[in-house]
């Protein structure tokens, strides 16, 4: 049986780093209601795939895209198109309007 040689680059960027990088990237391009969620490392150990979620105080509405962060350099190397993220956010916001409104009311009354 042949052994597979998998080239795994050095993991210089940890999960929390990928979230921080994605958060900064999002913050400079989209409104604050879009944020990062828990990342997943790809099978080759080269990219952190960070979900982009629509979130309001007290509620995460759902995923609207993703950002790929290099596990070796920390660079954003790929992402869902910004227009697609915004469109998905609008659609999810409309679909879950009652949930979002309830979260705001809970926050305001706290």
Label each PLM-derived region with a short phrase.
Residues 1-110:
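Long, terminal "pre-/pro-" and other extracytoplasmic accessory regions
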């Amino acid at each position: 049986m042949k052994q597979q040689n998998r080239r795994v680059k050095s993991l210089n960027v940890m999960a929390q780093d990928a979230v921080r990088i994605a958060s900064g990237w999002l913050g400079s391009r989209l409104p604050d209601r879009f944020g990062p969620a828990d990342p997943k490392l790809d099978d080759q150990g080269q990219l952190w795939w960070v979900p982009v979620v629509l979130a309001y105080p007290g509620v995460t509405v759902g995923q609207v895209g993703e950002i790929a962060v290099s596990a070796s350099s920390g660079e954003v190397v790929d992402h869902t198109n910004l227009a697609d993220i915004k469109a998905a956010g609008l659609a999810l916001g409309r679909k879950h309007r009652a949930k979002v409104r309830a979260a705001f009311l809970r926050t305001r009354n706290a």
